[in-house]
């Protein structure tokens, strides 16, 4: 299985980089996982609705450029479906069973994802109704992917 995490914005925090590196190392025996960082669109502090839409659209074009036609796309969005770790593990297992070898998780910037990215997504996933920093979501997502592989293989970890 090839998993891509496509994310807007450059990760600056050392502690997040270390956590991400650790989970990428752990995941290497289960799947090929890559994190693709795309530049965020520079924008002033107080944007109008129209300006926010333009920023999301520009970031969306960058995201869509990284997704091939045969990729199953899962958008991380606050309005997405919430799943338990076991349900998430089951859904990853089902994707593999049905021959979906390329999966891309998409994490938008601080303004979220464009309409076009949401249309391209096969499903939408939410980790919480709370707003979380998009940089932190990379680490949380990698941990949950790792947990899912451990659950699916019946290996200890997730309790």
UniProtKB/Swiss-Prot annotation:
CC annotations in GO: cytoplasm
InterPro entries cross-referenced by the UniProt entry: Alpha/beta_knot_MTases, RlmH-like, tRNA_m1G_MTases_N
EC number(s) recorded for this UniProt protein: 2.1.1.177
Binding-site residues for S-adenosyl-L-methionine, renumbered to this chain: 76, 108, 127-132
Coiled coil: none
Residues spanning the membrane: none
Pfam families the record matches: SPOUT_MTase
Subcellular location: Cytoplasm
Signal peptide region: none
Known catalytic reactions: pseudouridine(1915) in 23S rRNA + S-adenosyl-L-methionine = N(3)-methylpseudouridine(1915) in 23S rRNA + S-adenosyl-L-homocysteine + H(+)
GO molecular function terms noted in the UniProt entry: rRNA (pseudouridine-N3-)-methyltransferase activity
NCBIfam families linked to this entry: PRK00103.1-3 (NF000985), tRNA_RlmH_YbeA (TIGR00246)
The protein's assembly and partners: Homodimer.
Similarity comment text for this entry: Belongs to the RNA methyltransferase RlmH family.
Role: Specifically methylates the pseudouridine at position 1915 (m3Psi1915) in 23S rRNA.
Name of the protein this chain belongs to: Ribosomal RNA large subunit methyltransferase H
Species per Swiss-Prot/TrEMBL record: Bacillus cytotoxicus (strain DSM 22905 / CIP 110041 / 391-98 / NVH 391-98)
Record lineage: Bacteria, Bacillati, Bacillota, Bacilli, Bacillales
Gene: rlmH
